């Protein structure tokens, strides 16, 4: 359970996302990514080497969509760190906003409580985290917030 001042710090963090238009930027990136994926799918779903290169002999719209869905992750795997970096950048920006307009110390307290409540590790593997975690590790966020701290 967060104290009222910790809840205020979390709310200030979320308002930081709003202030910096993180949600709008994420939606635009998602839409552009989807349009690019549909464009590539449109190029590939009648292209015989796409099917043969993945061991499929039957060409159809359904098979093209299924095959594209199955293999696209292999080709986009290397872009994952770019998107996690952008997401983490947004989190640090929202943390700075919360530290400025609320309390860095209270946000630190709320982060610790939320990580414990969610059974998350405060020190995840850095390589795995760089690829798959949209939020920076709590330990790094806490160190950054301590530099911005109230005390």
Give a label for each model feature.
Residues 1-59, 78-151:
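Polar-ligand-bearing catalytic/cofactor-coordination segments
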Residues 57-70:
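Hydrophobic alpha-helical transmembrane segments
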Residues 69-81:
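Hydrophobic alpha-helical transmembrane segments of polytopic membrane proteins
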